[in-house]
Amino acid sequence: MSIRRGHARVLFNEGAYAEDTMRSGRAGAEVLRKARGQFEREGVEIKALRRCDAEGRDGTKLPACFKVYLPAPSGKFGLVFRFIRHREGLALRYLAFGIRHHPRDSNAQTVYEIAHRRLHGKLP
C-alpha cells in the first residue's frame, strides 16, 4: 500500500484497537474508526504529530511517543503512537486512543495513561 508523501505509515494492534473501540462509547468509536480508515489509506501527516511529554505531570512516561488530536486540530480525543522499524522503513505503531483529559474528579483513564500501561505493563 502506498502512503502519501509527508505521511507516516500506521500499524494497528488489533487487540488494543478493539479494546479502545469498545471503551470509547459511540462517538469515540466513530472517531477512531474514521481515523483508522484514513490513516491506513494515507498514513498520518508528519506535521500533525506532536511529541508526548517524556514524563507527564500525571506520572505517565511516554518517551519517544507522538500524538495526534481528533478531530483535528484540537479535539477532545487523542491517538498515541511510537515509531518502529518496519520492513518498508519506519512506521508508527498504534498504542492507544481515548479522551485526552478528564475532569479532575474522574477515575477514567486518559489516552496517555492507557498508552503508559501498554508500554510499561502497569498504570503510572
Stretches with model-predicted labels:
Residues 1-39, 119-124:
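Arg/Lys-rich, positively charged N-terminal/basic patches that mediate binding to nucleic acids
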Residues 2, 47-48, 101, 115:
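Intrinsically disordered, low-complexity regions enriched in serine, threonine, proline
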Residues 2-4, 60, 73, 86:
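A generic structural signal for short, solvent-exposed coil/turn residues
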Residues 7-9, 65, 91:
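A residue-level signal for beta-strand positions that form part of recognition/binding surfaces
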Residues 15-21, 57-59, 102-103:
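A short acidic, often aromatic-flanked loop/helix-cap motif at beta-alpha or helix-coil junctions
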Residues 30, 63, 76-79:
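Short, well-structured alpha-helical interface segments that form or flank functional binding sites
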Residues 40-72:
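A short, surface-exposed loop/turn module that caps and links secondary-structure elements
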Residues 69-124:
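Enriched for short, Lys/Arg-rich terminal
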